[in-house]
């Protein structure tokens, strides 16, 4: 066993032991810890922002993209939002112990299906430091412990955030090992975590294709993927074009570095001549580059030709792919071929067409007359989120506290034996 694997295993074993205490703790205790963590984050703001400045300086020296730098950056407002998110999670209804089904058998057995924590959740993520606290808060609320491995570009920020959160755990009398951040970012830590079958119960990777592939290929424990967000907005022939303009500007430009930002706009040929010039002007105002099909380039002189690779790329920047399609069927085929099954939207006043789109698009979240930017645990009413799963098993879409539970069956008898 390598020295790194030994270190990771020791930290994971301690977190696993702490998971037992968290699972058996009361709702009041976990909520107290969350509120105390929020206050500790506020009190530690100078230290956290100083650590973040250190990471930002290193990121700029390394030449990280604007999108990556934006994901990394913290300021007073973003840190306050992180603290408020902890308090919001504390206000959520505790899923642990919830009875989801109950029934009586003819032989008199009473069977109950009850929600219980998963155990130890490993979360591997890249530059966005708010994930450190969001993940810790959701795991704690749902009765789990977590072991976190962040990206090297955010190490100092993540350590400062984790230290503040640990103060909240201690204030409530919970073991600080219940939220464990690996204090190193060696690449070998990823397969090391994934090898700990029997200690780590699930792994949730959040990041780019390289990270996702590395985790999936090496893990010996179950993986729930937070995959790429190649999201689409399809403007149908029966769309309200003013609504469509507002939605595409929001979906693309509000926060282009987010995984739920739109990457591709599909426009029905019937409205292309009237709508695409509107799109061109709106994107110019937002300083957004358009990469389009030949018809798009003819209608938007500032657009540059799109490649096939563009339509399969999560830009995470102010770049919008645009393609003219001739039918709903062509739009669906494009999304199913080039998309990532994350979030896709149709803009139309035709309910029949909308219902067909919602049924045919095999994505975690599908929208009718709304921005893809709503794919978010907070916007769905889940509180913060651990990730947005594009898988089909156990969890799909924003992963809130219920998605961090499993269940067990309680069977109550009066002496029954099986014949």
Where on the chain are the PLM-derived regions?
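Short beta-strand-to-turn element immediately C-terminal to the catalytic PLP-Schiff-base lysine
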Residues: 234-238, 265-269, 325, 347-349, ...
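C-terminal core of ALDH-fold dehydrogenases
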Residues: 32, 278, 328, 333-418
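Rossmann-like NAD(P) dinucleotide-binding subdomain of oxidoreductase/dehydrogenase enzymes
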Residues: 91, 100-242
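Flexible, glycine/charged-enriched surface loops at secondary-structure junctions
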Residues: 25-29, 96, 172-179, 254-261, ...
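ALDH superfamily catalytic-core signature
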Residues: 5, 127, 134-145, 160, ...
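N-terminal Rossmann-like NAD(P)+-binding subdomain of aldehyde/semialdehyde dehydrogenases
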Residues: 1-110
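Short, well-ordered beta-strand elements within core beta-sheets of diverse protein domains
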Residues: 18-24, 265-267, 317-326, 341-346
């Amino acid at each position: 066993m390598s020295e790194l694997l030994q270190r990771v295993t020791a930290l994971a074993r301690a977190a696993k032991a702490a998971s037992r205490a968290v699972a058996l703790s009361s709702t009041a205790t976990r909520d107290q810890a969350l509120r105390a963590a929020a206050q500790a984050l506020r009190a530690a703001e100078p230290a956290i922002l100083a650590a973040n400045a250190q990471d930002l300086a290193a990121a700029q020296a390394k030449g990280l993209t604007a999108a990556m730098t934006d994901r990394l950056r913290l300021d007073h407002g973003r840190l306050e939002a992180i603290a408020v998110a902890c308090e919001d999670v504390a206000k959520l209804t505790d899923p642990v112990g919830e009875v989801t089904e109950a029934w009586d058998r003819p032989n008199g057995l009473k069977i109950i299906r009850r929600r219980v924590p998963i155990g130890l959740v490993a979360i591997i993520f890249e530059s966005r430091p708010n994930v450190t606290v969001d993940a810790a808060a959701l795991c704690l609320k749902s009765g789990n412990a977590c072991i976190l491995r962040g990206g090297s570009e955010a190490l100092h920020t993540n350590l400062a955030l984790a230290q503040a959160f640990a103060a909240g755990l201690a204030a409530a009398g919970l073991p600080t090992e219940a939220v464990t951040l690996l204090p190193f970012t060696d690449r070998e830590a990823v397969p090391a975590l994934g090898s700990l079958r029997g200690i780590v119960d699930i792994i949730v990777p959040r990041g780019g294709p390289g990270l996702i592939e590395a985790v999936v290929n090496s893990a010996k424990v179950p993986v729930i993927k937070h995959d790429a967000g190649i999201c689409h907005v399809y403007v149908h022939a029966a769309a309200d074009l003013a609504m469509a303009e507002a939605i595409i500007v929001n979906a693309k430009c509000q926060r282009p570095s987010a995984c739920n930002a739109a990457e591709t706009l599909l426009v029905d040929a019937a409205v292309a001549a009237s709508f695409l010039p509107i799109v061109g002007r709106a994107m110019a105002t937002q300083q957004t580059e358009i990469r389009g099909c030949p018809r798009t380039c003819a209608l938007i002189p500032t657009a540059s030709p799109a490649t096939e690779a563009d339509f399969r790329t999560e830009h995470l920047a102010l770049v919008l792919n645009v393609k003219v399609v001739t039918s709903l069927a062509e739009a669906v085929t494009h999304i199913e071929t080039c998309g990532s099954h994350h979030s896709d939207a149709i803009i139309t006043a035709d309910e029949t067409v909308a219902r067909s789109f919602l049924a045919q698009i095999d994505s975690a979240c599908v929208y009718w007359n709304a921005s893809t930017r709503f794919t978010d645990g907070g916007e769905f009413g889940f509180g913060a989120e651990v990730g947005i799963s594009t898988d089909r098993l156990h969890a799909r879409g924003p992963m809130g506290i219920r998605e961090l539970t499993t269940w067990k069956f309680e069977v109550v008898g009066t002496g029954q034996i099986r014949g």
